[in-house]
Design a protein with these regions (language model features):
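Primary recognition of RNase H-like, Mg2+-dependent phosphodiesterase/nuclease domains
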Residues: 1-199
Length: 199
């Protein structure tokens, strides 16, 4: 398994050709349920897919985060992705994926399931982000409180969550493609396929 990366600061898009799956969980103790939120975005910050799903109430916050992490990878596979960086705001989960600490025994089976799901991808990695920058997944997880069935979006996002996606795209560095036209001129086009570089 790749080493976890701990990062603070704003949401950071993945490098080409990878996708980033942000995940989060929410507890609804009054209804004995919990919510899972996942949003998958590309290197430009565009939404590839998202989900909001209600589940039974786990024993702890850590367990719902582990379930959300596992769901992030399985959702990525369901929508046909194979190169995925998974990102959440639970340091416990990110650390446990690279640890055999016995103190995690009460949910070790979930950690192992996460590793199995990650192993089904051509490339998988995991990073930590501060909760404030995981807001899209958080909103989707909390949205599950009112759902009877899971909801999925492909290349779309709920209207009430969309402003948070737009705000995160502000930090995406533009990518451009340089194409040699002559020995003296260079034509610049907006990125479509290959030969990209960060400004």
């Amino acid at each position: 398994m790749p080493q976890p990366v701990f990062r603070s600061g704003h949401w950071v898009p993945p490098d080409l050709p990878f996708y980033k799956a942000n995940f989060d969980g929410a507890l609804f103790r009054d209804s004995s349920s919990a919510g899972i939120g996942v949003v998958v975005k590309d290197f430009e910050g565009n939404v590839i897919g998202a989900l909001s799903e209600q589940i039974g109430l786990p024993a702890s916050v850590v367990e719902v985060e582990a379930l959300a992490y596992r769901r992030a990878f399985s959702f990525a596979i369901e929508i046909g992705l194979q190169e995925v960086v998974s990102e959440g705001d639970s340091k416990t989960i990110i650390s446990s994926l690279n640890s055999d600490c016995s103190c995690l025994a009460h949910f070790v089976h979930l950690v192992e399931d996460c590793r199995v799901h990650a192993g089904n991808l051509r490339f998988s990695a995991f990073t930590h982000v501060r909760r404030i920058y995981n807001v899209v997944a958080d909103k989707l997880a909390k949205k599950a409180r009112y759902l009877l069935l899971p909801q999925f979006w492909l290349e779309d996002i709920p209207v009430d969550v969309s402003p948070f996606v737009t705000r995160q795209k502000f930090y995406v560095k533009p990518l451009i493609k340089f194409q040699l036209v002559s020995s003296k001129k260079i034509k610049i086009k907006k990125n479509k396929k290959k030969f990209v570089t960060y400004l």
